[in-house]
């Protein structure tokens, strides 16, 4: 019985560790905060830590955005929420064909540090990722 309780506690800990954790700005490395401030001056943010990276969530020019940083301050990507109707036609067609009866809850444009653009469609609790032309790439848990 003791082994079962210990095992359950371990699994629960691992499960919670896999999700993003909100953190106080004071716990964000100064290199990350400096990099964010250079790219988005004067913007207030909320911070989360997930898989060793720091995610800033904020609003800029009326857009809901987020930016992902390595511990050393290197930004790896930014994400801007967009209207579902602004997703490429190929994304809409893919979802219609492969998720019959489901609707896209949210859309986003992802820009990687190297300038590569991808799109994200949240469908049925999952993030469906597409390239810049709307070609399906992968599904991630939401």
Residue spans for each PLM region:
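Mature soluble domains of exported/periplasmic/lumenal proteins and thiol-rich metal-chelating peptides
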Residues: 21-142
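Bacterial Sec-dependent N-terminal signal peptides
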Residues: 1-23
């Amino acid at each position: 019985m003791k082994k079962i309780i210990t095992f359950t506690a371990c699994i629960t800990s691992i499960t919670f560790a896999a999700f993003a954790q909100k953190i106080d700005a004071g716990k964000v490395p100064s290199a990350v905060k400096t990099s964010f401030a250079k790219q988005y001056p004067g913007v207030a943010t909320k911070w989360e830590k997930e898989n060793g990276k720091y995610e800033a969530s904020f609003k800029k020019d009326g857009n809901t955005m987020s930016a992902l940083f390595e511990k050393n301050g290197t930004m790896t990507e930014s994400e801007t929420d967009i209207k579902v109707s602004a997703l490429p036609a190929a994304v809409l067609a893919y979802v219609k064909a492969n998720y019959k009866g489901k609707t896209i809850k949210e859309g986003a444009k992802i820009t990687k540090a190297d300038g590569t653009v991808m799109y994200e469609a949240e469908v049925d609790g999952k993030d469906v990722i597409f390239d810049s032309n709307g070609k399906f790439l992968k599904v991630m848990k939401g």
